[in-house]
Amino acid sequence: MKYFVVALALVAAFACIAESKPAESEHELAEVEEENELADLEDAVWLEHLADLSDLEEARGFFGNTWKKIKGKADKIMLKKAVKIMVKKEGISKEEAQAKVDAMSKKQIRLYVLKYYGKKALQKASEKL
């Protein structure tokens, strides 16, 4: 259970990184530099900071691809977990559970699995108290 929560947190972190807005490119920075003529030292520092953001674009590309792979694997795992939960919870055959899960969207599958594990974690926490 602990590993599942840690994996879920990592997936959420990668999602935030992958969906962040793109940084300004070096070409756009050159245009800003020409327009503003950099009279102030503070402006020079600001533009220098923005020039470093081009490295972030490369990192975001790496994490974006990694995020897609992780998300795909997480979806497959959640699909399998949803089938197991339905078999255990509803007492139906594996084929019937698979048919029900196939009819659900990815979002519904995620919510179903997270709801199940959330209730399970809440029960364990209340037992310890």
Swiss-Prot record:
Insecticidal, cytolytic and antimicrobial peptide. Forms voltage-dependent, ion-permeable channels in membranes. At high concentration causes cell membrane lysis. Its main location: secreted. Expressed by the venom gland. InterPro entries: Latarcin_precursor. It comes from the Eukaryota. Cleavage of the propeptide depends on the processing quadruplet motif (XXXR, with at least one of X being E). A motif (Processing quadruplet motif) lies at residues 57-60. This is M-zodatoxin-Lt8c. It is found in: Secreted. Belongs to the cationic peptide 06 (cytoinsectotoxin) family. GO terms for molecular function: toxin activity. Both the N-terminus (61-94) and the C-terminus (99-129) of the mature peptide form alpha-helices which probably disrupt target cell membranes. The linker region (95-98) probably derives from a processing quadruplet motif (PQM), found in propeptides of many zodatoxins, hinting at a fusion of two originally separate membrane-active peptides. Keywords: Antibiotic, Antimicrobial, Cytolysis, Hemolysis, Secreted, Signal, Toxin. Coiled coil: none annotated. Residues 1-20 form the signal peptide. The keyword Signal applies. The keyword Oxidoreductase does not apply. One of its GO terms (cellular component) is extracellular region. GO terms for biological process: defense response to Gram-negative bacterium; defense response to Gram-positive bacterium; killing of cells of another organism. Residues 21-60 form a propeptide.
